[in-house]
A protein has these predicted regions:
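Short, well-ordered, aromatic-rich surface patches in folded extracellular/luminal domains
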Residues: 23-73, 105-107, 119-121, 125-188
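A structural signal for short hydrophobic/aromatic patches embedded in well-ordered alpha helices
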Residues: 113-119
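Feature marks short, highly hydrophobic, charge-poor N-terminal signal-anchor/signal peptide-like helices
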Residues: 1-8
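Hydrophobic alpha-helical membrane-insertion segments, chiefly the h-region
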Residues: 12-21
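Short acidic-glycine loop/turn motifs at beta-strand connectors
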Residues: 83-88, 150-154
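Short, solvent-exposed loop/hinge segments that bridge or flank secondary-structure elements
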Residues: 68-84
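Acidic/histidine-rich, surface-exposed loop or edge segments in extracytoplasmic proteins
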Residues: 85-104
Length: 188
């Protein structure tokens, strides 16, 4: 009789463990989770024409690490930020090179800074790429670029690609020079 109860106990325990194993969800692995996996989206509901011209926030990452020609701007990753706070335009930039050399600065810009910034956005029709997202899993953060612009009307331009540049080289150069992120030698 003792063996019967022991056998039933073991069978019951095995049944409970088996049910628990079937109910537990294992994490799903998708192809974009592995190194080299790609996520590519076009958000078609994002406007390709922005009505407002009043930028309140601007964030941009430009990578020239893999550029064939950096046009005197160095093979660097530039981070450019500008925002209107209490009527002032606060600007930040920093850049870094693969070897560790870097520079950063923060300053209050002239009143027409955002107007000049909007001119670059308009001249290169950056809104036409609005909603583009491309991400390759496993890449280091020194490649590609991103752009996030918020307007006073809450309109937004958002572009991201962690593999390739998102802006024309001329636009990249104009932005870097506008923010003052280039050194004196690079401006000449």
């Amino acid at each position: 009789m003792k063996w019967l109860f022991l056998g039933l106990g073991v069978a019951f325990t095995a049944l409970i463990c088996g049910i628990g194993a079937f109910r537990r969800k294992l994490p799903e692995k998708t192809s974009e989770d592995i190194d080299g996996g790609v996520v590519k989206r076009y958000q078609t509901d994002m406007p390709k024409v922005i009505e407002s011209t009043e930028i309140v926030s601007f964030q941009c990452v430009i990578s020239l690490i893999a550029a064939c020609e950096a046009e005197g701007l160095g093979h660097r990753v530039y981070k450019l930020d500008a925002a209107v706070r209490d009527g002032e335009v606060l600007v930040k930039y920093d850049w870094r090179e693969r070897g560790g050399k870097s520079d950063r600065a923060e300053y209050t810009a002239e009143a027409d800074f955002m107007v000049r910034l909007q001119k670059i956005v308009s001249d290169y029709d950056l809104a036409s790429q609005n909603g583009y997202y491309h991400n390759v899993s496993g890449l280091p953060d020194m490649y590609g670029g991103s752009l996030d612009i918020v307007y006073a009307t809450d309109e937004r331009i958002h572009i991201h690609d962690n593999q390739s540049g998102i802006l024309p080289p001329e636009a990249e150069r104009e932005l870097i020079l506008l923010f003052g992120a280039a050194t004196k030698l690079e401006r000449e």
